[in-house]
């Protein structure tokens, strides 16, 4: 498993757990958004510059 995928999944899991305990939807939405942004940006950078 690639490290950026692992970081995105852990961040997503963390935001879900925080949502379960706080019932704050804003934390859940921001966590999902950040996880998706990290995954997409790092994947693009990794594929474009590392795998040439």
From Swiss-Prot:
Cysteine disulfide partners in this protein: none
Keywords noted in UniProt: Cell membrane, Membrane, Transmembrane, Transmembrane helix, Transport
Domain of life: Archaea
Topological relation to the membrane, as annotated: Multi-pass membrane protein
Compartments (UniProt record): Cell membrane
Location (main, coarse): membrane
GO CC, alphabetical: plasma membrane
Induction details: Up-regulated upon UV stress.
Transmembrane portions of the chain: 1-21, 27-47
Role description: Part of the Ced system, which is involved in DNA import.
NCBIfam families in UniProt: Ced_CedA2 (NF041798)
Subunit architecture: Forms a complex composed of CedA, CedA1 and CedA2.
Protein name (database record): DNA import protein CedA2
Gene name as annotated: cedA2
């Amino acid at each position: 498993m690639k490290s950026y995928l692992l970081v995105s999944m852990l961040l997503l899991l963390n935001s879900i757990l925080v949502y379960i305990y706080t019932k704050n939807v804003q934390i859940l939405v921001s966590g999902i958004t950040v996880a998706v942004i990290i995954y997409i940006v790092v994947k693009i950078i990794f594929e474009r510059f590392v795998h040439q």
